[in-house]
Amino acid sequence: MWPSNRGPTLFQYSIRCLGFVAFIGVVRCHCPHMMGVKPPGPPSGPSPPGKFPDGDEGWDYDETAAPGIVPEPHFIQSTYIYRSPNVQEKTFSSRVVNVLKDIRTRLAKSARLTLENENIECSSPTDHYRCQEYPASGTWNYLIVEDQQKGAVTYTFDRKFNEKNDGTIEMALLDAFSRHSPSSLIAFASSEAEKEVGYIRALTVQEMDSLSGKRSHQKISMEKFGPNELILLEPALLEVRTGANLKLNSDSLRRIDSTKEFDKLLEEFRNVFILFWNSNRMVSLHTFNLWSRVADKIKISEDTLLAHVPCHDNADFCQGLNSEDYHTVVSYRNGQNTGKTENIGDVEFYENWVELSLSGAIQRLPNESKLSEFKKGIVGGKKRSSVTIGVFPSDQDTSFQHFQIAAEKLSGKYYVAYFINENSKPAITTYRHAEKQKRTDYSGKFDPATLMEFITKSSIPSIIGISNGFTTDLLFHQKRPILIQIGGAGEFEPFSKLSARQDARKTYIFTKIDGESEMIKKTKKALGVGENESIIVFLNKDRVHRIPISKPKCPDHLQKILQMIITSEADQVLSTKEPHPLRYLQVEKVNEVFGFEETLVLPDHTLFLDSDPFSRHPPITEGGGGGCPFMQGGGAPTESSQHSEL
């Protein structure tokens, strides 16, 4: 074990950055240019050692850590909520806030951990929704830590056990955060804290229930994809294409070849969108083709630039990127990273994403005319499938501030706006003009988490059309069975009415297939459906059940049939050694976008699993990031008088 006061040697640090011993010296293994931070000038000579920008010691650098430890990128969300009715307790809680701020900065630099923390003070009367869930009297300090793998855990840490010095507070907090991190964070403690012992304890379920009689545990679940992300292209299908006849040039795209040029463009243009790509990778090649077509078509203002970095010609400039980064588009505003998308869609998808990025997370509607227009789904002169509008008496209203936080967390995915009406109570509504039920009103608490749940769930169509493809993780790698209406003249009422019920959509995913293309015929054949047959297919992983459309008489009857099917023998069991029947629909979309190619559809047993075991990255909550800083784009938290965010 290395002494705690000894940092990594130059040789050890090079091994940790590069993973091999062929290079000795300090190597820039992060990519500062990706977030608008100016790196040093271009090196001279062949492959010289790089230099970190001032104040930056590298993502995996920590002078007190054992050499060779390179933490995995991770995201954690936390809330420090406290009630300090006297001076002694106020002093302690103030120290905790300062220590949290210091920890956040240090872990981001040294442990590649993105920590998003919110401080909530409940000592005086407040509207903050979280205070209502805890005792209205007494003294308490709670830390709620949440990550996607373990969910939320509430910890208690008392002043009397941790007030010795800031080091004891730090060790208590690091103990809690370590339980939600891939590896222990104790190694990243400050010199003041490393010899201290803090005390923090997770509350039991019984203790949680006894905190407040009004407290209720309701798990928040959100849709992963927005309405513009329902038909994304599958990278695995792009990998097996030849890429022949792809257009690989565009007069509308600016090529960037150096850090100096990159920095100049960030200063010259207010908005910059950049694709980093590599011609040696088939997925990246197809993404560049799409991006060049977007640049030729989209209408943008003079202060906005679409550009690309050909990494196959600029290896040093793109150092630190991985395979997924080579089909990622990054957005900048006023020189700062504001977001990114690694999703691959058609030209319309990228157009919508750019427009959403330019318009911001939330728009203010200045008058009744604009409000009426937005309600009809008209945003930026185009008809959108869904929009969400909040009406508030003031932009200082707590409900509005929480709505704003929710919108910023979902930035780049949804069309969200607000209207100020001094005589109105807070109200939020989602409008979907193509649905039978055109509006959905919000009736929950005005807290960011449940507002996000409402926006994501109310914006998705009740029945998702998959005839022309679908996003892989929309149907695969999740627990809900898939219901597919195939054939039938017009709308099948029991199916459509059941899909309109929120509780039913929590249990099933409702989809529909129309048409008779060759790929649709292959899908129907693989599911055991005749060419002219009208049927509902109940697909539960590899189990196929077929329900004739004529059988259900009403929504309730259909629901009973579905409940009985769960325990009955399947009509057909799909083989994991054969291509998944729905994969053919995704091939159809790829051919539509890039032109027809005879595509070999391969079996993939992971499509039958709840999650992809070969996913490169662990799931990260929206807005999270790690590793290369340009991956950390997203909505910024908003401060209010009731709570501050570090």
Curated annotation (Swiss-Prot):
Residues 40-60, 620-646 are annotated as: Disordered. Residues 622-636 have a biased composition (Gly residues). The keyword RNA-binding does not apply. Residues 1-29 form the signal peptide. Keywords: Signal. InterPro entries: Thioredoxin-like_sf, TXNDC16. Disulfide bonds: none annotated. The keyword Signal applies. Residues 40-51 have a biased composition (Pro residues). This is Uncharacterized protein R05D3.9. It comes from Caenorhabditis elegans.
